[in-house]
Amino acid sequence: MEALQFSSVNRVPCTLSCTGNRRIKAAFSSAFTGGTINSASLSSSRNLSTREIWSWVKSKTVVGHGRYRRSQVRAEMFGQLTGGLEAAWSKLKGEEVLTKDNIAEPMRDIRRALLEADVSLPVVRRFVQSVSDQAVGMGVIRGVKPDQQLVKIVHDELVKLMGGEVSELQFAKSGPTVILLAGLQGVGKTTVCAKLACYLKKQGKSCMLIAGDVYRPAAIDQLVILGEQVGVPVYTAGTDVKPADIAKQGLKEAKKNNVDVVIMDTAGRLQIDKGMMDELKDVKKFLNPTEVLLVVDAMTGQEAAALVTTFNVEIGITGAILTKLDGDSRGGAALSVKEVSGKPIKLVGRGERMEDLEPFYPDRMAGRILGMGDVLSFVEKATEVMRQEDAEDLQKKIMSAKFDFNDFLKQTRAVAKMGSMTRVLGMIPGMGKVSPAQIREAEKNLLVMEAMIEVMTPEERERPELLAESPERRKRIAKDSGKTEQQVSALVAQIFQMRVKMKNLMGVMEGGSIPALSGLEDALKAEQKAPPGTARRKRKADSRKKFVESASSKPGPRGFGSGN
C-alpha cells in the first residue's frame, strides 16, 4: 500500500511541529536527518547520517520499468550548477590528499559548471584560481576526505563571492524611510513594490506605495489592486503628472499620515537611455531616498551584473532585488552581481505570492547550490505557518498515538503554505535530488487523499477506528469522493501506520540521539501493539491490525516516498 505519497523515508509522514525558539522537531524533518533539526546542530548538512539515509532511500526507490534512476532532472534555479559541482568532487573519491594533479580535472568541471550557469567570465577565473590555490596549499586534515575538503573550500568561496554577510535594509532615523525601486521593463518592479510592503508589514512597519509609472498602461491600476491585496494604501496622481511631482506629493502625504516606509514604483524601459536616467535622477532628488534598489530579473544571467554597474554609475544605488529566483534558468546573476558591481543583493523573490520575498543569505544560498539544503530557512518558514500552541498540541497527540485525519489535513495544508513541494524539499538536506516527476505524483496523491478526508464526517475524522471497523463507511466515502474503495482502505491503514512511526521518531528525538540506519529502519517497520483492556477491545484492535496489514499488502500509486 502506497496511499500516502507525501512522505520521506519509507513513507514516513511529512508532519510538521515547531517547538522552542527557531526549532523544528517533527517526523517531517527527522525522517531526512535522523534526529532533531535546529539552527546549531545542522548548520552543516553534509553529515554522515544524511548521506547514509539518502543512499538508502535511493536504493529503495524505483522509477520507471523496474530500473533504478541514475540521474535526476533538476528544475530549480542553480540545478544545473549543483549537478556540475557534484560531478567535480566525485572525481576525488579514493584520493588521500589534494594535489595540483588530482584537482586539475575537478577544477575544469567547476569552471565549466560556472560558465554554463552564466556566471561572468572574469568572476569565474578569479573564483577558480582562488579555489585552486587554497586546495593545493591545504594539508591533510584527519578524518576529512579530499572531496569534503574541496566542498568546504568551494562553499566558503561561494559565500565570499555573493557578498559574505547579509546586507539588510537600512531605515531612516527620523521621518519616513523612502525606498525607490528602479529597473528595466518586465522585471517585476510593480509586483516587488507590493511584496516589499508585505515583507515590511510583517516587521510591524506601516507602509505606503507611490504609483510613479505613468507610461505603462494599467500600471497604476495594477499597483492599486496589489496594494489592496496586502492591505497597504497607494498614492496615485494620474498619468498626466511628472514622476518627480508625484514623488514630491506622495512623500508629503506619507509624512502627514506618519507612515514608516514609503515605496515608490518607477517606469521601466526596454533599454537604458539618457531620458530614463534623467527622470530617475529627478525623482531621487525630490525623494532623497534611504534605499535605491535595482530590481533585476535573475534569468538575465551575467547581464544582470553589468546592469547593476550601469545604474550605480548613473544614479547611485544601494543594492539589488533579484526576482524570479524560483525559475529554471541558470542563475549566474546571483553569483556575479556583488563581485562585478560591488553592490549587494538585499532581497530575492522566489515565487508569485506576496509572501515570496525574503532576505538574501549568501551562506544559505551557497548551501543550496552545493546540495546541502537550507535548514534555517526551513525552520523560519515552518514557524510562520504554525503557532507554538498548535505545535505543542500536535506533539502531545503524536506521543499519545491519537493523530487523526484532522491533524493530517492541518499539517499538509501548513506545509503547502511554506511554498511549493519542490521548494520545501530543496531546503531539506539530501532531498534536492528528488525528481520533478516524483514530486508531481506526490502532489497529485495529496489531492486524492484530501478529497477523501473532506467527505468524512467529523466523528470519522477524529476516530479512524470507525472506518477500520466498517466496510460500509469506507464504501460511502469512496462513492462520495469519487475514489475507489481500495484507495480509502489504503488511506485508513496509513493513518494507523503514521501513528506508530511518528511516535517512534518523536521518542527518538526526545532522547536526543541519532540512531544507526538499521535502527531507523527498524523504527519505521514497528508494529502497533494492541491496547490493553477487555477482550472486546482486544478483538477490535486485532481486527484493525489485520485490516492495516491487508491494506498495506495491496499495491498503490508510486510517489517519491514509495518503497516499491
UniProtKB/Swiss-Prot annotation:
Q: What is the effect of changing residue 537 to G/Q/K/N?
A: Loss of binding to CAO/cpSRP43
A single Gene Ontology CC term? chloroplast
Q: Looking at the keywords, is Mitochondrion present?
A: no
| G-domain as annotated region, ranges | 76-370
Q: Which GO terms describe its molecular function?
A: 7S RNA binding; ATP hydrolysis activity; GTP binding; GTPase activity; protein domain specific binding
The record's top EC class is: hydrolase
Q: So what EC number does this one have?
A: 3.6.5.4
Localisation:
Plastid, Chloroplast stroma
Q: According to the UniProt entry, which residue ranges have a biased composition of type Basic and acidic residues?
A: 460-483
Q: In which tissues is it expressed?
A: Most abundant in green shoot tissue and lower levels seen in the roots and etiolated buds.
Give one Pfam hit by family name: SRP_SPB
> Mutating residue 539 to G/K: effect?
Reduced binding to CAO/cpSRP43
Q: Where in the sequence is the transit peptide found? A: 1-75
Q: Which CDD domains does the protein's record reference? A: SRP_G (cd18539)
Between which residues do disulfide bridges form? none
- Which domain of life does the UniProt lineage start with? Eukaryota
* Region of interest: M-domain: 371-564
Among the GO biological process terms of this entry, one is: protein heterotrimerization
Catalytic activity annotated for this protein? GTP + H2O = GDP + phosphate + H(+)
Its annotated function is as follows: Involved in cotranslational and post-translational sorting of thylakoid proteins. Binds GTP specifically. Activates the GTPase activity of CPFTSY when bound together. Required for light-harvesting chlorophyll a/b-binding protein (LHCP) integration into thylakoids.
An additional note in the Swiss-Prot or TrEMBL entry is: Unlike eukaryotic or prokaryotic signal recognition particle (SRP), the chloroplast SRP from higher plants lacks an SRP-RNA component. It targets both chloroplast-encoded and nucleus-encoded substrates to the thylakoid membrane, post-translationally for the nucleus-encoded proteins and co-translationally for the chloroplast-encoded proteins.
HAMAP family the UniProt entry points to: SRP54
Q: What is known of its domains?
A: The M-domain stimulates the interaction between CPFTSY and the chloroplast signal recognition particle (cpSRP). The C-terminal residues (539-564) are required for interaction with CAO/cpSRP43.
Family affiliation: Belongs to the GTP-binding SRP family. SRP54 subfamily.
Q: What is this protein called?
A: Signal recognition particle subunit SRP54, chloroplastic
